[in-house]
Design a protein with these regions (language model features):
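Short, small-residue-biased leader/transition segments that mark boundaries at the very start
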Residues: 1-7
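Conserved alpha-helix/loop element of class I SAM-dependent methyltransferases that forms part
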Residues: 39-57
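A short acidic, Gly/Pro-enriched loop at the edge of an enzyme's catalytic core
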Residues: 112-122
Length: 205
């Protein structure tokens, strides 16, 4: 999630990212900050996703699920079969009981230990930001998603071009691996003046 000032120079590798979020999760400070900051990413992204993913039994992979904010929104929209993955064990421990079918500690900068076409859709909200998950993860999301499935994500506007997400997104379109459904700038964390690109793409196989 975070802002550039908080984490650009602090998070240099996976271990530091994990430590940062484990510390942020202490005393449930993470969720309190999300409320205080008026973090709208999960709500807005899930609203867009639910407009196109009509099957409420769809098997969904929530990549970078944190404390389950996206899961809460998915449940509100009637979805019930979703799995969560996050790098921070501490944040996973704060996920409400019985919200997800399965929770796993995963480094999304590495190949995801899932079969090809295992999921109907992938959600990734607040994870493409400074010092976090890089563009190659998008190819892994496509790999684990079935044909015609959806990949819905946010990208912090500060890294969209700097990290090469703009080029990766276009490359995947040119390679006919997915097609754009929606892509627009959202407020994300309005109270901190942090915007993000919100994308919804449909997988082609």
């Amino acid at each position: 999630v975070g802002s550039e000032m908080c984490i650009r120079d602090r998070l240099k590798d996976t271990v530091e990212v994990m430590k940062y979020y484990d510390e942020w999760g202490d005393g449930n400070k993470y969720d309190k900050d999300m409320v205080d900051w008026n973090y709208t990413g999960p709500k807005e992204t899930t609203k867009v996703f639910s407009e196109f993913q009509k099957n409420k039994d769809a098997k969904i992979y929530d990549a970078g699920c944190g404390t389950g904010l996206v899961g809460v929104e998915l449940k509100k929209h009637g979805f019930k079969n979703f799995h969560g993955a996050d790098l921070s064990k501490k944040l996973l421990e704060l996920v409400p009981n019985d919200l997800y079918e399965k929770l796993e500690q995963v480094d999304l900068n590495k190949p995801i230990n899932k079969k090809d076409n295992e999921y109907d859709s992938v959600m990734c909200v607040g994870t493409f930001t400074f010092g976090h998950v890089k563009p190659p993860a998008l190819e892994e999301f496509i790999r684990i998603t079935k044909n015609d499935g959806f990949i819905c994500f946010t990208i912090n506007e500060g890294i969209h071009e700097e990290y090469g997400f703009d080029k990766k997104i276009e490359q995947l379109k040119e390679q006919n691996k997915w097609k754009e459904i929606k892509f627009f700038k959202s407020d994300y964390i309005a109270s901190k003046d942090v915007n993000a690109w919100l994308g919804l793409y449909q997988v082609i196989k």
